[in-house]
């Protein structure tokens, strides 16, 4: 099975972007409550 760099990058971005977005949102909420 050949590793598709473009597909791998797209998958990584698809996972990382929402995760980082939720993480930032959580940090903002936590700092507001503190």
UniProtKB/Swiss-Prot annotation:
GO BP field: photosynthesis, light reaction
GO (cellular component) term, any one: chloroplast thylakoid membrane
InterPro entries membership: PSII_PsbM, PSII_PsbM_sf
Principal location class: plastid
Domain of life: Eukaryota
Keyword Transmembrane helix carried by entry: yes
NCBIfam families: PS_II_psbM
Subunit and partners: PSII is composed of 1 copy each of membrane proteins PsbA, PsbB, PsbC, PsbD, PsbE, PsbF, PsbH, PsbI, PsbJ, PsbK, PsbL, PsbM, PsbT, PsbX, PsbY, PsbZ, Psb30/Ycf12, at least 3 peripheral proteins of the oxygen-evolving complex and a large number of cofactors. It forms dimeric complexes.
Family named by the database record: Belongs to the PsbM family.
Role, per record: One of the components of the core complex of photosystem II (PSII). PSII is a light-driven water:plastoquinone oxidoreductase that uses light energy to abstract electrons from H(2)O, generating O(2) and a proton gradient subsequently used for ATP formation. It consists of a core antenna complex that captures photons, and an electron transfer chain that converts photonic excitation into a charge separation. This subunit is found at the monomer-monomer interface.
Protein name: Photosystem II reaction center protein M
Naturally occurring in which organism (per UniProt): Stigeoclonium helveticum
């Amino acid at each position: 099975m050949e590793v598709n760099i473009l597909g791998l990058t797209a998958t990584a971005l698809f996972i990382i972007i929402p995760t980082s977005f939720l993480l930032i949102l959580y940090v903002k909420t936590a700092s507001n409550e503190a």
